[in-house]
């Protein structure tokens, strides 16, 4: 596999030595900048695009949406810190991980209908070591995707899911179908 890290933030640019600080791009041009950053490639080449912010952050959602629409990803990984209840500096509560996955996939499918969420990466520093595995398994069952703490166990399970290369995993196909809402 050939892979290129596409940095979109200042820290990523320092690590990679190149990239595009997407938060410095005028909002109207964010999607176009993201598209330039991640051109079409051969099937055996992966662009790993550094994500920014969240669709749920009142100050940075436009950056996230532009990056999501412009890069037109085939797969996304949702990242979260266990115990975080709101975005820094905001009183708006964070959504449940399932809602977060559903919203990011729905918005991403506007420009790539085949988009799927391949996993959740959690920072579990607040979870006792003896409870970590059970916690990750519970989140995986609830979200129906692979769940790891890459800081503890590495990202191999997420990479394995990416390598499966299926157009739509069964869990994502079920999630994509309209679901009845309950009160």
Where would I find each of the regions flagged by the language model?
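Flexible phosphate-sensing "switch/lid" loops adjacent to ATP/NTP-binding sites
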Residues: 1-183
């Amino acid at each position: 596999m050939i892979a290129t890290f596409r940095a979109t933030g200042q820290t990523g640019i320092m690590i990679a030595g190149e990239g595009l600080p997407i938060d410095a791009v005028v909002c109207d041009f964010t999607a176009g900048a993201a598209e330039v950053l991640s051109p079409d490639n051969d099937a055996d080449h992966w662009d790993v695009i550094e994500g920014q912010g969240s669709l749920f952050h009142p100050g940075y959602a436009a950056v996230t949406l532009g990056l999501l629409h412009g890069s037109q990803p085939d797969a996304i990984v949702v990242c979260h810190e266990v115990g975080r209840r709101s975005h820094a500096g905001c009183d708006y509560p964070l959504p449940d991980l399932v809602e977060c996955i559903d919203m990011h996939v729905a918005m991403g499918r506007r420009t790539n209908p085949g988009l799927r969420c391949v996993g959740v990466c959690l920072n579990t520093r607040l979870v006792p070591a003896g409870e970590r595995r059970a916690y990750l398994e519970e989140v995986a069952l609830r979200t129906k995707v692979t769940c790891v703490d890459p800081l503890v166990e590495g990202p191999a399970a997420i990479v394995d899911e990416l390598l499966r290369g299926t157009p739509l995993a069964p869990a994502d196909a079920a999630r994509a179908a309209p679901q009845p809402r309950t009160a």
